[in-house]
Amino acid sequence: MAAGERSWCLCKLLRFFYSLFFPGLIVCGTLCVCLVIVLWGIRLLLQRKKKLVSTSKNGKNQMVIAFFHPYCNAGGGGERVLWCALRALQKKYPEAVYVVYTGDVNVNGQQILEGAFRRFNIRLIHPVQFVFLRKRYLVEDSLYPHFTLLGQSLGSIFLGWEALMQCVPDVYIDSMGYAFTLPLFKYIGGCQVGSYVHYPTISTDMLSVVKNQNIGFNNAAFITRNPFLSKVKLIYYYLFAFIYGLVGSCSDVVMVNSSWTLNHILSLWKVGNCTNIVYPPCDVQTFLDIPLHEKKMTPGHLLVSVGQFRPEKNHPLQIRAFAKLLNKKMVESPPSLKLVFIGGCRNKDDELRVNQLRRLSEDLGVQEYVEFKINIPFDELKNYLSEATIGLHTMWNEHFGIGVVECMAAGTIILAHNSGGPKLDIVVPHEGDITGFLAESEEDYAETIAHILSMSAEKRLQIRKSARASVSRFSDQEFEVTFLSSVEKLFK
């Protein structure tokens, strides 16, 4: 009897849910239609706003070209791409209106332009309008201690919405890797959209790190020790990679900065027909006046590291390798060696990392041989590179490595990480001659530094010449040609 009652209750429950199916379907359909109507209405309003903004004083419509670069005043390699891209477009489309969306609200537009000239020696030939965004904190990694990728990506949508509400461009280019803004500007703003990808937000390498339960700057130790948490994170990464691929595929033009980035973007976005490699512009010409022969202004050798103070740059590895080099006395007495870190700090988190690096050098007893130069002018950077014997780079799977190219152009012998762009595109043989060195572990770096310093001056000069000859393909001029060719589709 009880079994019969349970069966009757189950049938009744199924009939109840079945009766709700069609009404639920109608409600969902109605809500979807309403959402489409609202979004379409917003799009129409934005189109009217666009026409008002793009009309000049003489009544003619002007094309509005906007770059989304929330950290345009940071002074890194990504910012050099931004300013060179703007300069190239202004040469070809001088009548257009140029806009940069930025979150650098603590400075004004003139100060940003002066900073670009001071750091990169770039001065634009036409005016640029800056749209200052107040919600940049939504894309700060410090706001999301967990689910950082998802948090920053969702935050970029709100930041993109703020940008779109202030200015609706004809052409939108994301030059900083915020792919989740692409569908917003394409389908709501009605813009032609392009993207320059420095580094995929997620990559198959990141999936491998979690799958193999390896510790990394983006994979905490407590997760690697727990198989269940590792599986949960792996599922989260796969879902995020799928969504990242969907939003990235909205781009009408995709530019990537290296072979390594190309392989990952083709795998994730699957838009090979509109994806091209556009090597980032490196100010090769500026460094060519540095003599290749070794200067002996001061005794000993100078080692330099050029790059922003971000966790993925792995600066601690350089200090540990340097300490190992000194402690094992692989080279001459310590006073003859000095390691100088040169880079930009974007925010308080970067400043905190610099302080942590200072403490690490103190803990290892090498603080008197290590210096930090923060946000220094371009001329000062050039002076350091002119005196350096070795340039250090330790980022695993660096997307490209503008700092690596600058070191090679300046005549510094580069010692880079054996992965990513440096391995595939930069530190490669030129006409059969080596152009630099690659390493991975702390021991590798220490031994290779010792090997370079033990070479004769003539051998080092030969490597310098080959390296300098090889980097002409990364010049500003080459960038302008390939960039303009790639974005041409956006202006048709």
Curated annotation (Swiss-Prot):
Q: What is its EC number?
A: 2.4.1.131
Which GO terms of the cellular component aspect does the record hold?
A: endoplasmic reticulum membrane
Q: Which GO terms describe its biological process?
A: dolichol-linked oligosaccharide biosynthetic process; protein N-linked glycosylation
Gene3D superfamilies in the record: Glycogen Phosphorylase B
Q: Which residues lie within the membrane without crossing it?
A: 234-254, 400-420
Q: Name one GO molecular function term.
A: GDP-Man:Man3GlcNAc2-PP-Dol alpha-1,2-mannosyltransferase activity
- Topological domains annotated Lumenal: 1-19
Compartment(s) where it occurs, according to its Swiss-Prot or TrEMBL record: Endoplasmic reticulum membrane
Q: Indicate the enzyme's highest-level EC class.
A: transferase
InterPro entries with a match to the protein in the record: ALG11, ALG11_N, Glyco_trans_1
User: Could you tell me the keywords of this UniProt record?
Assistant: Endoplasmic reticulum, Glycosyltransferase, Membrane, Transferase, Transmembrane, Transmembrane helix
Major location category of this protein:
endoplasmic reticulum
**All ranges on the Cytoplasmic side of the membrane:** 41-233, 255-399, 421-492
- What is its membrane topology? Single-pass membrane protein
User: Which reaction is catalysed here?
Assistant: an alpha-D-Man-(1->3)-[alpha-D-Man-(1->6)]-beta-D-Man-(1->4)-beta-D-GlcNAc-(1->4)-alpha-D-GlcNAc-diphospho-di-trans,poly-cis-dolichol + 2 GDP-alpha-D-mannose = an alpha-D-Man-(1->2)-alpha-D-Man-(1->2)-alpha-D-Man-(1->3)-[alpha-D-Man-(1->6)]-beta-D-Man-(1->4)-beta-D-GlcNAc-(1->4)-alpha-D-GlcNAc-diphospho-di-trans,poly-cis-dolichol + 2 GDP + 2 H(+)
Source domain of life is: Eukaryota
* Transmembrane residue ranges: 20-40
Q: Which family does it belong to?
A: Belongs to the glycosyltransferase group 1 family. Glycosyltransferase 4 subfamily.
Name of the molecule in the record: GDP-Man:Man(3)GlcNAc(2)-PP-Dol alpha-1,2-mannosyltransferase
Query: What's the source species for this entry?
Result: Pongo abelii
> What lineage, starting at the top, does this entry show?
Eukaryota, Metazoa, Chordata, Craniata, Vertebrata
